Structure formats: structure tokens, C-alpha cells
Amino acid sequence: MRTSAGADRHLPKLTSCNEIRHMRPLRIAPLVALLACARPDAAAAAADGADTVVVFTAASLAVPVRAALDSFARRTGAVVQQENGASLELARRITELGRVPDVIALADQEVFPGVLVPRAASWYARFARNRMVVAFTDRSAGATRLTASNWYEVLSRPGVRVGRSDPRLAPVGYRALLLYRLAEGHYGVPELASRLEASTPPALVRSNASELVALLQAGELDYIVDYESLARANHLRFVTLPPAIDLSDPARAAAYALASVRVARRTDTVTYAGAPIVYGASVPRAATHPAAGQRFLSFLLSPAGQAVLRAHAVDALRVPELVGDSVPPALRATRQ
């Protein structure tokens, strides 16, 4: 959840975000979107460009969505294109640069009501969860002593190099800071959040996860604070953190919300409150190939698509939720 102070003229002025946030979600049946598995006929493909699907993907979803796109292409014959980046950066490519994909899949579903709805998108799907972990390699300083109970001591020691993503661009960046605040309360260690933040100097704050992974694997970093799916996709070692702080448990939403961080942007400051990690996806209003985008998203939410996500350590929701009044009929028809 986010609130902002000041004006950001680079983002759309949203007048109905609260309306979208409080729309009743639509539950999608597990037998969702069999249409996604059927190849469109040639006339339909020619009419709406269904043979091409362009997808913007949050960095932590890059590998799972690539696998899903490949599976979709094999089933339908579609030409698939993927562009990866930090979630907030991807959203701004749409709102500021006018570069509009057929599907956008982001690491924080709140980016939709906060940035994209209602101008760039009119609905979105909540489709997956994740958890925060501490990833490392055998060469990491203190790796032989690292455990789930002392990770914060190891990371806050002098000389240990910890990387994290830029909270102005990537949800995982502000989630790392929220993790630190929750850890301070959970472990009862005064000033722990400040100490953990100090373990990452500005030079080790990067715009996307791929840079952090490369630095970690090259030995330029000792640890990165990121998602479990990213660690698994890159075959990194990682420490699983307590559910009380790893932002994975929907039942702990109220407890997570007790933590908050303020992030200074170009023209304003945004406050993010802790919340369970939930991924979101949509077909933007100005998509070039909207029907093809809907077919791919239907596939991604189907049992076959969910299986691909789970194979890459993404906790796909068995019953995804659709939020908004303008859900495409092909998706709406699948709800219970």
C-alpha cells in the first residue's frame, strides 16, 4: 500500500484509485481460460494481430514468464516478445514514454491502482505471491556461519557488502526496507533497520535484480535481499526468513502494515506500508494486440500456466482474482 505527498507531474493524476482498490475482486475458476490453449483461426489472427504478443515483465518474473511464453508459443504458434525491468520503471514506460505492451506483469499489484489505473489500464489480475529471502554464494563473507536466526547479525557486520534494488524503481527495493523494519520489531534489536540499511551504500543500490545477481555471482557482493523465485531461478543459495517478516503470508497482512518506509522520488515522497507480496498483470487499454494479450494472460492464469510459474518457485494463486469493472469477457466468463 502506498500514499504520496507532493505532486509528481510525470505520473498520471488518478481520481478514481480508491474506487478501483475497493472493487470486489472476481474469483477465477481453476479451469480457467481453455481458450488460451486453442490456436486462433487465420482471419482472427489477421484482424487483431493475435500472432504477436509483447509482454513487459518485472525482473523477478523474467524467467518464469519466459517459460510461460515459450509454452504459449508452442501451443498457439504466436510470436512472443518479452521486455524485462523494474516494475515502476515498466509502468512509467507506458505512462511517460507511450510504449505500450500487450501484457504487463508486475511484482506489486498496487502499482496498478497507484499508477496505471484508470488511464493506462482499467482492470488487473492478482495472480501470484512470493517471499523475501537473503541470497548468497559460497564465497560470501560469513556464509559458513549464516543461519535463519542470525542473518541480520551477519549482514550488519562491518565490511559485508549487501546489495538491494532501488526502491524508487522496484517494489523489491522498498520491500527490503520494510523487511528490515519488521525484523527490528521481530528480533527486538533497537536500530536494527538503520544498521541493515547502512550495509548497502548507494553504490550497491541497483536499478534491477539482474545487476545484483551478476555482482553477487562475480564476488562483488556478499548478499542480496530479493525474492525467493529470483534466487531459485539463478541457482543461488538463500536463507528462508520467518513468515513474520518475509511478506509472504496473507494472514499476517495487519502485522506487516505496521511497518512503513518513506521513499523520496523526483518530485514527491511516497510512503509504502508493509503488505503481503502479490503480483499483478493486465492488458493495457492501448495494447496493439489486445486479443492476443488476453489469450496469453488467460493461459498464464490457467492450470497449465500456474504449473509453469510454480516450477520456477513463483507461488501462483490457485484462484486468481480479477479487479475492475472492465474485465474482458473472455476472462470474466471463467469466474465462478
Cite the ranges covered by each PLM segment:
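Short beta-strand-centered segments that line the small-molecule binding cleft or hinge
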Residues: 101-108, 112-126
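Bacterial N-terminal signal peptides
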Residues: 27-36
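Exported/periplasmic ABC-transporter solute-binding proteins
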Residues: 38-40, 45-97, 108, 116-117, ...
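Extracellular/secretory pathway and lumenal proteins
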Residues: 21, 31, 40-42
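Intrinsic disorder/low-complexity segments in short proteins, especially the signal peptide
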Residues: 16-19, 36, 40
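Short, intrinsically disordered or compositionally biased N-terminal tails of bacterial proteins
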Residues: 2-3, 9-24
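Short, solvent-exposed loop/turn segments at the edges of secondary structure
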Residues: 129-130, 276
